Amino acid sequence: LSGMEDRTERSSCLRVGTYAVMHKIVLDYSLDKLLGQFFSERDMALLLDLAFYSIVEESNVAQHYPDYAYNHPLYSSGMKIYSDASVSDFFKSITKDKSTGFLNEWNAKRNRRERIYISYDSTNKNCQAGEIELAEFGHAKTDIGSAIINYSVGYDLKNKEPLFYEAYPGSINDVS
């Protein structure tokens, strides 16, 4: 129809429910300010978008992110939809210093007088992407014949807040 704008870049119906809930969590924990200490505005917004994607879709497959971004609200300026290649490049750009700095600041905000009980869990993930240093053959929980990566998280058992996370090569046995 004449006068109608082209809507091919974004869906005309955005799924805002989970975004509203998770946006409140970002505000309550000041995650945007905390992440802003270590990331540019663009990178912080993309990181939040990818975190939301991972939670909502229960997936971290970069090639599916653009499909998710098409019909969900985004933090990225202008709700820009980044390609899977851009997502991959972004993850490569996250340094150990940024990750450790964020964790140190996150943990510095904890109530030091409160007793905590730490739970630790690790798992492995099949990896079909090429040339990832951590991806090695090992003992996968669900063996599909591909290389795997291992990752672990330590969190406060009482409130489920993460305290520590780590990725390590797939050839190291998961013994947690």
Description of each model-found segment:
Residues L1-L134, Y151-D174:
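Dynamic "connector" segments at or just before major functional cores
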Residues K141-G145:
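Carboxylate/His-rich catalytic cores and anion/metal-binding grooves
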